[in-house]
Amino acid sequence: MKNVIAAAALSLVLSDFTYAHEQRDEAMMKITPSTLADADIQAVSPALARFGREAISNDLWQRDALSARDRSIVTVAMLIARNQPGELKHYIAVALDSGVTPAEVSEIITHLAFYAGWPNAMSAVSVAKAIFEARGVTAEALPAASPTLLPLNEQVEKQRADTVEKNVGPISPGLVKFTADPLFLDLWQRPALKIG
């Protein structure tokens, strides 16, 4: 899961395209932008509307390499990182309809706060709150603020800590502490986004 989010962060340029089709059960669910209808796009840029249908809806979102669930996670992560609340509202709903849990949406927002910026995460919180309320998602469906963390791989953590200390410790001891305490010893050990 975290690898998917990391891949999303590296693929931000792809998030400009916001059309999609996705197979859900037996029926095809049409995914369209939350803020613009195809007719509105065509009124300004017929070519952009065509590229959206042909390259994005009929190709990218139809590929088997990612499930609807994983593709939705990547899209939500990119929209959070780029602070695109208009499209985020639509794609959080798509993610929930594609099997992403409210707990996972919550953890994606939390995780990206550290990498995409706190203001972007706060914007995402505002969007997700409205969607959660509309869908009846309660606090019980969300991860605890301080859950039991996943087991720490001590050997890998020591190697990571030693590398960070060697490379940045002499010039930025605060970065060494900050990457260890809230990130690798807490955030990355939270169970709601575990791989698998």
Which residues fall in each region the model found?
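Acidic, glycine/proline-rich low-complexity segments that act as flexible tails and inter-domain linkers
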Residues: 19-69, 82, 93, 97, ...
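Short, structured motif recognition centered on aromatic/hydrophobic residues
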Residues: 70-79, 88, 108-109
